[in-house]
Amino acid sequence: QESGEVIIEIPR
């Protein structure tokens, strides 16, 4: 299962 959506959240 591969999704073409990558969500990365970086705390500043």
UniProtKB/Swiss-Prot annotation:
Native source organism of the sequence = Lonomia obliqua
Name the UniProt record assigns to this protein: Unknown protein 7
